[in-house]
Amino acid sequence: EEAWLAMRDEGEIHDLLLDECLHGISGTDSKPGIMKNGVVKAGVTPLQHKLLHCVGTVAKEANLPIFCHHDPKVQSGYDILNVYASAGVEPNRVILGHTGDCNDWAYQEDLVKAGAYIGFDRLAYGHLDNPVKNSVKNIVELVSKGYINRIFLSHDWATYLAFWDSWDKTVSQDYLNLDIDFTYIS
């Protein structure tokens, strides 16, 4: 929970984000092509609700899609979509990231049936939360049901990092070593 955001009301955050979407980020002419949120393992807390609603409102006004990180093990995707809907955002404008981290095929199907996109976006280290073979099985099942256009396959940038090791190992890795192919799914 971010103190800077907790201290500000939704209107103030909204105005800052909308200005950056319409006029440029931090005084530049660079504008976002997508909005982004994240929901913690605790699910949609009061602060998360405020931020989801705010980002949803800005995304609607600026005509931007939304990517939202979430923890599918607590099934917060339902609440996330409901908050976005209360801000006027249709589910087909939302990607729920990390949905493939769980092996709950019914949950994944519910989200795509609702119209959202889902991310199987951490496949390279799926062994930590959900074995890759389970994710592949769920992807095949979803594709066989006609949801191929609702699934984002990737592996999060974190797959390049030694997240599960020490910081020293992380910063000492050579990410520009072209002899290492980080684009595999095992």
How does the language model describe each region?
Residues P46-K50, K73-A87, W105-K113:
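Distinct, well-ordered alpha-helical segments
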Residues L176-S186:
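Mid-to-C-terminal alpha-helical segments outside catalytic/metal-binding sites
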Residues H49-C54, V132-I139, K169-S172:
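Charged helix-capping and loop-helix junction motifs
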